[in-house]
């Protein structure tokens, strides 16, 4: 993994990407799934760093994403058998979280999905497999991709109610699923950070 300081070009690209919500979402989505320029240029530069990852040691899966300053980040553990069965369930790629925290974090997964299956159907399946309830939903037009963006409520045996903001989009036969989650009582505090991080996710592999 390589880490570099966020530069002005990246700051502006993130702000630009966040501003492209398609249509006018209903008020609940606006409140719970914020988009747009949520931080100033100075706040972005101080509060986030651009990290580069190469999951599975495969350049085809290389990606860039903003990670909040001070958070721990690493490639996800996975079973090699998951890669050969990536049409059956999502495969973990990366994850990060505040130092020492176990009640919030961000992760990215991928799943190989036939081109004739819409991402919205993948989202529905993902929520069902997590025993989740979709509380708010919208579609975003971000540069080079259309994104299914939704807030899912789940229950963790140890943590209780959890809110998960999920953005999913397609690149070829790959659907990327980026999730930012927290215990319900912390979601309001972190929702702008989650929005900025998820919108910054950029697969760079070819």
Region annotations inferred by a language model:
Residues 109, 151-153, 179-181:
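Residue-level recognition of well-ordered beta-strand positions that form the cores
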Residues 80-82, 113, 119-171:
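Signature of long, low-cysteine stretches enriched in small and polar/charged residues
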Residues 2-12, 16-102, 140, 158-160, ...:
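N-terminal targeting sequences that direct proteins away from the cytosol to non-cytosolic compartments
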Residues 111-114, 129, 181-185:
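Short, solvent-exposed aromatic-acidic interface loops
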Residues 90-121:
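A short acidic-to-branched-hydrophobic micro-motif
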Residues 105-107, 148, 176-177:
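Surface-exposed aromatic
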Residues 109-111, 119-126, 191-199:
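Surface-exposed flexible segments
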